[in-house]
């Protein structure tokens, strides 16, 4: 894998009931979506819960709660993320397992775009 998936817990960030985690995938500067914002057509086309709600560098996020790929994330990589803070989201529905699955699906889409660009 040339991307890195990770989760950040929402338990200390949100005073209301939401999912337990938000999911993120970091991509290197060579990725075709590197630097694109969440309103870019290619980013809006990504199929993830609630759409992509974060794009930016890792330095603007809290430290990951769960590094799914057991790697350090380079500071210059670009991050795409989704949150579990939508109406109807809750800790039972968006627990660690479910958020991990959704994050892996986002990672798979970003990996496929990387492969197509080569």
What do these predicted regions represent?
Residues 1-118:
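Acidic interaction surfaces
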């Amino acid at each position: 894998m040339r991307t890195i998936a990770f989760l950040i817990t929402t338990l200390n960030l949100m005073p209301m009931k939401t999912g337990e985690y938000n999911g993120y995938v970091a991509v290197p500067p060579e990725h075709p979506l590197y630097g694109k914002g969440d309103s870019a057509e290619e980013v809006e086309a990504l199929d993830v819960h609630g759409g992509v709600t974060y794009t930016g560098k890792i330095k603007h996020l809290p430290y990951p709660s769960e590094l799914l790929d057991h790697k350090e994330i380079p500071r210059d990589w670009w991050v795409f993320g989704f949150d579990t803070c939508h109406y109807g989201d809750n800790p039972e529905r968006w627990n660690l397992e479910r958020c991990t699955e959704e994050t892996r699906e986002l990672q798979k889409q970003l990996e496929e775009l990387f492969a197509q660009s080569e």
